[in-house]
C-alpha cells in the first residue's frame, strides 16, 4: 500500500451521525482510502472527499429509513450506501448485493474488520433474482447509488420489495430532470407516491438527493396519472430523532415528518 494517500481526518459531524461507532466509520474510510483505491473501487482523487462526498453523504440516508427496516443495497460496490447506513443505524439489517466477486471479497473483509457481521450480509448476485430469498422474502427498503437510469432501476427493484416497500435512489444534481423524464414509466410500473427528498441539509457539506418511491400492490397504468411529483423535500432532522418519528409516519415504509413541502405522483 506504499504510495497510497492517507485517510482524511474525522470531521466533527461524524460523531453526531455515528455516535459510538465513529471509530468503525473512520476505519471504513481508512479501508476505502487504501485497499479500496488499490483494488480500483475508489478513485485516488476521491480520497480527500471520502467523508463528505461518500460516507457522510450516504449515512444521512438514514433520515428517511424507518425503524428496524430490512434493507438491500443493490449494486453495493465499495459498500456505498449500505455500510454507512448500517453504521449510522444499528437497528437496521442490511444486505449488500453485488455481482462482482472481487468487490464481494472487499465487502466481506470490511464487514469483518469493522465488526458488523451480525448486522450486514454480503450476497453475490444480480438484482432482482439474487435479492429475493428462497422463501420468497422481499425487503422493506431498497437503496441504490448511481446504479441505472431511474425507470430501469424502478423495474429492477420493484420485484425485490414487498407492497408498501420503498425505493431510495441516490442521484446527482439533475435529479428533478431525471424524475421528469422517468415519471410516467415509474407510475406505469406501480410506484406511487414518488417524490424527491434532501437528507442531511444543514448538517453535512453535501446533502443527499434521494428519489423516494413507494411500491404499490400491483402494476397499473392508473398509477402514472397522479400529480407531478417534481418537488424537493428537505430532511434535516438528526438521525437519532428519525427512529422515533418514523413510527408515527402515516405511510407504510415512509420516513419521519420532514421540513418543507413536496408534490408527489
Swiss-Prot record:
One of its GO terms (cellular component) is cytosol. It comes from the Bacteria. Keywords: Cytoplasm, Methyltransferase, rRNA processing, S-adenosyl-L-methionine, Transferase. Residues 212-265 are annotated as: Disordered. CDD domains: AdoMet_MTases. GO terms for molecular function: rRNA (guanine-N7-)-methyltransferase activity. Residues 220-257 have a biased composition (Basic and acidic residues). Its EC number is 2.1.1.-. S-adenosyl-L-methionine binds at residues 75, 80, 145. Its main location: cytoplasm. Coiled coil: none annotated. It is found in: Cytoplasm. InterPro entries: rRNA_ssu_MeTfrase_G, SAM-dependent_MTases_sf. Belongs to the methyltransferase superfamily. RNA methyltransferase RsmG family. Specifically methylates the N7 position of guanine in position 518 of 16S rRNA. This is Ribosomal RNA small subunit methyltransferase G. It comes from Frankia casuarinae (strain DSM 45818 / CECT 9043 / HFP020203 / CcI3). The lineage of its organism: Bacteria, Bacillati, Actinomycetota, Actinomycetes, Frankiales.
Amino acid at each position: 500500500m506504499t504510495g497510497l494517500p492517507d485517510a482524511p481526518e474525522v470531521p466533527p459531524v461524524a460523531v453526531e451521525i455515528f455516535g459510538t461507532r465513529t471509530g468503525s466509520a473512520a476505519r471504513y474510510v481508512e479501508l476505502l482510502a487504501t485497499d479500496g483505491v488499490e483494488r480500483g473501487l475508489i478513485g485516488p482523487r476521491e480520497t480527500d472527499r471520502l467523508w463528505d462526498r461518500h460516507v457522510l453523504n450516504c449515512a444521512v440516508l438514514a433520515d428517511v429509513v424507518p425503524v428496524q427496516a430490512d434493507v438491500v443495497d443493490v449494486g453495493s460496490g465499495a459498500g456505498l450506501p449500505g455500510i454507512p447506513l448500517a453504521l449510522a443505524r444499528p437497528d437496521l439489517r442490511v444486505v449488500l448485493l453485488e455481482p462482482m466477486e472481487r468487490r464481494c471479497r472487499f465487502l466481506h473483509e470490511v464487514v469483518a474488520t469493522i465488526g458488523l457481521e451480525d448486522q450486514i450480509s454480503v450476497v453475490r448476485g444480480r438484482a432482482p433474482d439474487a435479492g429475493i430469498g428462497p422463501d420468497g422474502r422481499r425487503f422493506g427498503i431498497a437503496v441504490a447509488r448511481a446504479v441505472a437510469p431511474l425507470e430501469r432501476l424502478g423495474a429492477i427493484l420493484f420485484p425485490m420489495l414487498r407492497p408498501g416497500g420503498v425505493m431510495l435512489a441516490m442521484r446527482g444534481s439533475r435529479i428533478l430532470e431525471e424524475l421528469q423524464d422517468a415519471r410516467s414509466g415509474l407510475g406505469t410500473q406501480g410506484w406511487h407516491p414518488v417524490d424527491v427528498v434532501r437528507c442531511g441539509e444543514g448538517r453535512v457539506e453535501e446533502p443527499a438527493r434521494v428519489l423516494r418511491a413507494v411500491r404499490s400492490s400491483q402494476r397499473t397504468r392508473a398509477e402514472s396519472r397522479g400529480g407531478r411529483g417534481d418537488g424537493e423535500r428537505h430532511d434535516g432532522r438528526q438521525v437519532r430523532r428519525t427512529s422515533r418519528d418514523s413510527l408515527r409516519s402515516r405511510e407504510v415504509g415512509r420516513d419521519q415528518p420532514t421540513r418543507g413541502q413536496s408534490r408527489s405522483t
